[in-house]
Swiss-Prot record:
It comes from Syntrophobacter fumaroxidans (strain DSM 10017 / MPOB). InterPro entries: aa-tRNA-synth_I_CS, aa-tRNA-synth_Ia, Leu-tRNA-ligase, Leu_tRNA-synth_edit, M/V/L/I-tRNA-synth_anticd-bd, Methionyl/Leucyl_tRNA_Synth, Rossmann-like_a/b/a_fold, tRNAsynth_Ia_anticodon-bd. This is Leucine--tRNA ligase. It catalyses: tRNA(Leu) + L-leucine + ATP = L-leucyl-tRNA(Leu) + AMP + diphosphate. A motif ('HIGH' region) lies at residues 42-52. The gene is leuS. GO terms for molecular function: aminoacyl-tRNA deacylase activity; ATP binding; leucine-tRNA ligase activity.
Length: 829
């Protein structure tokens, strides 16, 4: 065994051993407890970054730990390979996205293997593989049959930079989640998945996921946005129809003095047609549609609008209400129409003041003698209260009035109690090339026709010329576009939109259970064995994107009979970011640390250990070069501990726990079992790898103390061997290469991964005596040793009898003695 720790020499050796012996490949073993551990698979951007290293190191510790605990662990890896970034990068590099993607996959796979992650590579796939997305196309057809996939004209989020539509969940603060450029509203024909059919189940199950972070569940609940309220009809003054409004404040209806419509509302053009305001309204509508979405939803937005020239009727007062188009009303919420109650809604209040519209107070605070006059208001009163100036409902509390007013309007056919959701159907059409083709054709005679299952897959053509601006080449690619109608055999055109890449990531975890199955998308017996994922690990930024879509998709597949679970992920860990110099690592900030450089300098085990030790997994990790060097020094200490004493360790029998031991050895024996318990519980119960590693460091220190003072304790080596072997097994999930090498050098022939996880002895944990700190008036004055089973009264008596404590008491009366058993005693005089 070399004296010096040299990770380059040992790491490749053990990686090749693991691969040759296929130690990470698994199959279904009936009767053996399974554990499916999965980290969110990466987009093959070209190189892994430190965020990947941290994420995957966390998962690998758990996977290795559970294997050693006897679980049948599935730990797969693949590639989220479709999408705009690959297409844009390929255009820039003047190559094809497929070539760019698969070259990146090859390099990133080698990086992951260099880090020693215990993936079952036999299950690897990329979502751009035809063998994967062919089954996704089948799911689309099944959803189309059930009405869960449909096409309609809709105002959608359009990114002019990426030249494609975005789902609502992909708009962050009014900007594109990919390029951070403004998103505008554009009317287009789009394909949707009817996620709203599952809205109640999606919401209900957020209360049945105890292994998920509360923050993620709250984000999903807020995104679903369930509101109990009233749907009210406001007849148009012209008599030509009505405007439907959703409100949670029917109690304020008597104070509604005007109506606000979203610029995208379908009635706007008809309401202004032929009126003097028509051209002004249309200009306003066009400008509002081009505005940044986040600007329109901002609290500080300057409220603007235009009178349409039409009015509607307040259904309880009979008063005419002017109808405005307003920039702060959006179609995504409610019905795109807002009954404006300026006395009791701040946005309406600001709008009314600006345009000189009437303000009518109809709610007063419950503890107020009278309502304030409208002209006295400096802001809207938005709380519940008691109704005033509201006809027969005056004097009612808000909650009571909401029910009564809605019920009375329902009797007249002008209202009903209803539930409204913020969640909208998932728009999956993307006007880009690099994605899974939608299996639909259009025939002038037959209309929209699904591709027959026997004709799947619809293969994305590779012989295309990518356009410099990123627009899809498919509409101009005749061999793909032109086809025969499956119904009549006549000429037809293929759908040229591709599917949102989040469709691929909404079911990949199930495919990992049967990645090589070619008779269908999912092999039910295998999926039944492995699903659901027991532990999922990834970033919180996916809370209302990937995680919500995956939950929806699993419920759809369950109802198709393809799965037998209700939820995809039993437990979820959202790890923090890796930051440097106070900011998230990014090329633009110039603070990126390349994992390859770190591995070359320090080895994979050091990089892994630092990522695990520097911070709890749910917190951000601040990169520190000194911290990396410290991790390397620690592994070097373990190496030297064994290399310096290898012959003694090899030849010594292992301590079996029997017989009395001198105090230094008894303390080490006890420390060994305390460490086993601590590390086991920290990994199993809390994922607190940082405190587990700290406990291992303490054990190393204590082993060194015994070894360096060995002659005074007799034959130390059986107890030291017990401690060292436990140490190697405990550190192996974090630093597997060095653990394998040392384990082999100690004379073992099996891989560490195949060894059972060490068990602690309850007897060994019990010290025959414990040392207590004794304070007098809060200051350390002595230490005493008492039997481990001493009562608090016995501990107090021993402290007061101690000679050093008596010196500091010096005859003063003892006012109080505070005993913290097995830790500290404080004497107050």
């Amino acid at each position: 065994m070399d004296y010096k720790y040299a990770p380059k020499r040992i790491e490749k050796k053990w990686q090749e051993h693991w691969e040759r012996e296929k130690l990470f490949e698994v199959s279904e073993i009936p009767g053996r407890e399974k554990f499916y551990l999965l980290e969110m698979f990466p987009y093959p951007s070209g190189r892994i970054h430190m965020g990947h290293v941290r994420n995957y190191s966390i998962g690998d510790v758990v996977a290795r730990f559970l294997r050693m605990r006897g679980y049948n662990v599935l730990h797969p890896m693949g590639w989220d390979a479709f999408g705009m970034p690959a297409e844009n990068a390929a255009i820039k590099a003047k190559t094809h996205p497929a070539r760019w993607t698969y070259e990146n996959i090859a390099y990133m796979r080698s990086q992951l293997k260099q880090l020693g992650f215990s993936y079952d590579w036999s299950r690897e796939f990329a979502t751009c593989d035809v063998s994967y997305y062919r089954w996704e196309q089948l799911f689309f057809l099944k959803m189309y049959e059930k009405g869960l996939a449909y096409k309609r004209s809709a105002y959608v989020n359009w990114c002019g930079t990426c030249l494609t539509v975005l789902a609502n969940e992909q708009v962050e603060g009014g900007a594109c989640w990919r390029c951070d450029q403004p998103v505008v509203q554009k009317e287009m024909e789009q394909w949707f998945f009817k996620i709203t059919d599952y809205v109640e189940e999606l919401l209900d199950y957020t209360h049945r996921l105890p292994g998920w972070p509360e923050r993620v569940l709250t984000m999903q609940q807020n995104w679903i946005g369930k509101s109990l309220g009233s749907k009210l009809l406001f007849p148009l003054a012209s008599g030509d129809g009505s405007i439907t409004v959703f409100t949670t404040r029917a109690d304020t209806l008597f104070g509604a003095t005007f109506m606000s419509l979203a610029p995208e509302h379908p009635l706007v053009e008809g309401l202004c047609r032929g009126n003097p305001q028509e051209s002004e309204v249309l200009r306003f509508v066009q400008a509002a549609k081009q505005a940044k979405r986040n600007d329109r939803e901002a609290e500080l937005l300057e409220k603007e609008g235009v009178f349409t020239g039409s009015c509607c009727i307040n259904p309880v007062t009979g008063a005419k209400m002017p109808i405005y188009v307003a920039n702060f009303v959006v179609m995504e919420y409610g019905t795109g129409a807002v009954m404006a109650v300026p006395a009791h809604d701040q946005r309406d209040f600001e709008f009314a003041r600006k345009y000189g519209l009437p303000v009518k107070v109809v709610i007063k605070p419950a503890d107020a003698a009278a309502a304030p006059a409208a002209q006295e208001l400096s802001a809207a009163f938005e709380d519940d209260g008691v109704l005033v100036d509201s006809g027969a409902y005056s004097g009612m509390a808000s909650a009571e009035a909401r029910t009564a007013i809605t019920a009375d309007l329902a009797g007249k056919g002008l209202g009903e109690q209803t539930v409204q959701y913020r969640l909208r159907d998932w728009g999956i059409s993307r006007q880009r090339y690099w994605g899974a083709p939608i299996p639909i054709v259009y025939c002038d005679k037959c209309g929209t026709v699904p591709v027959p299952e026997k004709d799947l897959p619809v293969v994305l053509p590779t012989d295309v010329a990518l356009l410099p601006n990123g627009a899809s080449p498919l509409p101009a690619h005749a061999p793909f576009l032109n086809t025969d109608c499956p119904r009549c055999g006549g000429p037809a055109r293929r759908e040229t939109d591709t599917m949102d890449t989040f469709v691929e990531s909404s079911w990949y975890f199930a495919r990992f259970a049967c990645a090589r199955y070619d008779q269908g998308p999912l092999d039910l017996p295998k999926v039944k064995y492995w699903m659901p994922v027991d532990q999922y690990i990834g970033g919180i930024e996916h809370a209302v994107l990937h995680l919500l879509y995956s939950r929806f998709f699993v419920k759809v597949l369950r109802d198709m009979g393809a799965l037998e679970v209700d939820e995809p992920f039993r437990n979820l860990l959202t790890q923090g970011m890796v930051i440097k110099d106070g900011a998230k690592m990014s090329k633009s900030k110039g603070n990126v640390v390349d994992p390859d450089d770190m591995i070359k300098a320090y080895g994979a085990d050091t990089v892994r250990l630092f990522c695990l030790f520097a911070s709890p997994p749910e917190k951000d990790l601040e990169w520190s070069d000194q911290g990396v060097e410290g991790s390397f020094r620690f592994l070097s200490r373990i190496w030297r501990l064994v290399s310096d004493n290898l012959d003694a360790l090899r030849s010594a029998p292992r301590h079996n726990g029997g017989g009395a031991l001198p105090e230094p050895l008894e303390a080490l024996h006890r420390k060994t079992h305390q460490t086993i318990k601590k590390v086991t519980e920290d990994i199993r119960d809390r994922f607190h790898f940082n405190t587990a590693i700290a406990a291992i460091m303490e054990l190393v220190n204590q082993i060194y103390q015994v070894v360096e003072g060995g002659s005074r304790a007799g034959n130390i080596w059986p107890v030291v061997k017990e401690a060292v072997e436990a140490l190697i097994l405990l550190v192996s999930p974090m630093a597997p290469h060095i653990a394998e090498e040392i384990w082999h050098e100690l004379g073992h022939t099996r891989s560490v991964l195949l060894e059972p996880w060490p068990e602690w002895s309850g007897k060994a944990l019990q010290a025959e005596e414990v040392m207590l700190v004794v304070q007098v008036n809060g200051r350390l004055r002595s230490r005493i040793t008492v039997p481990s089973d001493a009562t608090p009264e016995q501990m107090e008596a021993a402290a007061l009898a101690d000679s050093r404590v008596q010196e500091f008491i010096a005859g003063k009366p003892v006012r109080k003695v505070v005993v913290v058993p097995k830790k500290i005693i404080n004497v107050v005089v």
